[in-house]
């Protein structure tokens, strides 16, 4: 049986890490696409030359033409400029919006049946623009944010409690930015909710609040440490979890930037919520109950995303007609 084809649009740090992970997991054959000549070809050849050592048979190629996307079952989009120190995700808006228009047109022409995962920041606005530009069904276009933010939250909690990351579950909803909403009441260690762990004396509410703040600033913390770029290992691993759930019909419940059409009281927007990803794409939106401060924080986050989308509409009004 022929292997699935996975197209990586953008061959920077995340793109290269994605290609390597796909090879190691043998999720499919990889085509790396980038407008920079030589970069996708060089990276794919380098990774391919590691295959005899690591023992995988997935094929990797590089290309500078959108035609190379033809037949891809999954497209993962990282194209655009990365965030630099002192730069907010919002600063990236006008530059990366133009990139999403071009990428959307390329996917529409050559891989209209693909499952599309967007990683480009500012995420919630870019995945919205990508769906509009491509005209693809909303259930087949998602943004990678919540899996990454939740993974950071889980890591910090596991470190705090000195337990395995495998026994920590956590949900981070809302926009992928400073207004994201780490949900304490839906986060657990071995099924025990965080509020109960506070009562048990494992930690304090003040310490949980510090971890929530660190999660919100997780991306900026890495940007400030690296000084020349942004995170790429954890974002790539997060996107792979989403792609694998689609390709293997695993139906995992993952927090993703998904298109909402009335769910959570939100319409015509992409916002981070729990979804089931299977062979049909986003098969279900898990509309968990939000109340009190959680609802207030979620609504504030939605407002921040709406501001970005409104800015997109002003910059590229033609997107609304697509």
Swiss-Prot record:
Per the record, a Pfam family?
Ldh_1_C
Q: Which InterPro entries match?
A: L-lactate/malate_DH, Lactate/malate_DH_C, Lactate/malate_DH_N, Lactate_DH/Glyco_Ohase_4_C, Malate_DH_type3, NAD(P)-bd_dom_sf
Cite the active-site annotation. 176 (proton acceptor)
Q: Where does NAD(+) bind?
A: 10-15, 34, 96, 119-121
- Key words, A-Z: NAD, Oxidoreductase, Tricarboxylic acid cycle
Q: Which family does it belong to?
A: Belongs to the LDH/MDH superfamily. MDH type 3 family.
Record-linked HAMAP family? Malate_dehydrog_3
The role this protein plays is:
Catalyzes the reversible oxidation of malate to oxaloacetate.
- What is the official name of this protein in its record? Malate dehydrogenase
> What organism is the protein native to?
Nitrobacter hamburgensis (strain DSM 10229 / NCIMB 13809 / X14)
Gene that encodes it: mdh
């Amino acid at each position: 049986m022929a292997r699935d084809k996975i197209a990586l649009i953008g061959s920077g740090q995340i793109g290269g890490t994605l290609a390597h992970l796909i090879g190691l997991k043998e999720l499919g054959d990889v085509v790396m696409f980038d407008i920079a000549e030589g970069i996708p070809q060089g990276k794919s050849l380098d990774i391919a030359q590691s295959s005899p050592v690591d023992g995988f048979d997935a094929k990797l190629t590089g290309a500078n033409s959108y035609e190379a996307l033809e037949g891809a079952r999954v497209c993962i989009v990282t194209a655009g400029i990365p965030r630099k120190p002192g730069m907010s995700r919002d600063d990236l808006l006008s530059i990366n919006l133009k990139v999403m228009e071009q990428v959307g047109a390329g996917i529409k022409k050559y891989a209209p049946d693909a499952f599309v995962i967007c990683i480009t920041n500012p995420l919630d606005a870019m995945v919205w623009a990508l769906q509009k530009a491509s005209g693809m069904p909303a259930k087949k276009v998602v943004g990678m944010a919540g899996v990454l933010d939740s993974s950071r939250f889980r890591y910090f909690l596991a470190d705090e409690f000195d337990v395995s990351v495998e026994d920590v579950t956590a949900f981070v909803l809302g926009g992928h930015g400073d207004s994201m909403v780490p949900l304490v009441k839906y986060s657990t260690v071995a099924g025990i909710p965080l509020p109960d762990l506070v009562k048990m004396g494992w930690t304090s509410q003040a310490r949980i609040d510090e971890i929530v703040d660190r999660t919100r600033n997780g991306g900026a913390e890495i940007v400030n440490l690296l000084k020349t770029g942004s995170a790429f290992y954890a974002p790539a691993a997060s996107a792979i979890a989403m792609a694998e759930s689609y390709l293997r019909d695993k139906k995992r419940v993952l927090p993703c930037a998904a298109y909402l059409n009335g769910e959570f009281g939100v319409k015509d927007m992409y916002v981070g919520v729990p979804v089931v990803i299977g062979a049909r794409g986003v098969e279900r939106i898990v509309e968990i109950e939000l109340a009190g401060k959680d609802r207030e924080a979620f609504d504030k986050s939605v407002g921040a995303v709406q501001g970005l989308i409104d800015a997109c509409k002003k910059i590229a009004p033609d997107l609304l007609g697509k």
